[in-house]
Amino acid sequence: MSISVNDIIEAQAHIGTLKSEAHPKTNKYWAGVVNNIAVINPESIIEQIENAKKKIQAAKAEWKEILIVSEKKMYADELEILGEKYGFNYLNYKLPSGFLTNFETLKKRIESMNTMARFVDTENYLSLTKKEQLVYKRKLARVLKIYKGVKGLTKKPELVIVLDGQMMDNFINEITKTPDVQSIIIAGTNFARRWAEDSIILANIWSHKSVDFILNSMFS
């Protein structure tokens, strides 16, 4: 289904930051300024979402691993729901450093988590005391909170989608150091970097409604 300008406006995806907080590098995507708020051109958002959708479809066709990364606490639960719905890997809490540049080490942590999760279903786990079981489950819960969205990830992601480019600046540094990894950056008008035209979505990232609309449009 094609996206219309009305869809963008209804989702409030076109609303940017205050003009004083917006970065000059983003003003080519603006439609103007209203009440001191940078307003993003809905046509630009439509084109960017369509570009992202094509990139995702191409990655799926080649069975590439897709990962969405976000540290926005307000959107953690929704991202988990979307990850399960569309079958993509996700990190929705604290992002481990070196996830791309030191993936083999992180992969071992994921494998360890999966081993721990399997152990809970064994007789050996049942043979533990109630206190030992409780301690073990608490330890597993801490690991799952960070890594459960990537429990099926067996190789370095080949397409990474970043929610809030400015907030995830350190992770974007990792992306720039791993040229074999494709990216889609979803950012607001405060984004301070230049990025490839076919790999960025400049939109409202501070609204549940807007983010839901963007991600569902990308994957549906």
Which residues does each predicted region cover?
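N-terminal, positively charged regions that mediate nucleic acid binding
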Residues: M1-E65
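Residue-level signature of catalytic and energy-coupling elements of molecular machines
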Residues: Q12, I68, V160, I214
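Short, ordered loop/turn segments at secondary-structure junctions
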Residues: A13, S44, E71-M74, Y93-L100, ...
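Short glycine-/polar-rich loops that comprise or flank the Walker A/P-loop
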Residues: W63-K64, F88, K155-E158, P179-Q182, ...
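Short hydrophobic alpha-helical runs that function as membrane-insertion/retention elements
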Residues: E65-V69, N89-N92, I161, Q182-A187
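Long, charge-dense
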Residues: D77-K139
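Extended, charged alpha-helical interaction scaffolds
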Residues: N124-P179, I184
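Short glycine/threonine-rich loop/turn motifs
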Residues: F171-S220
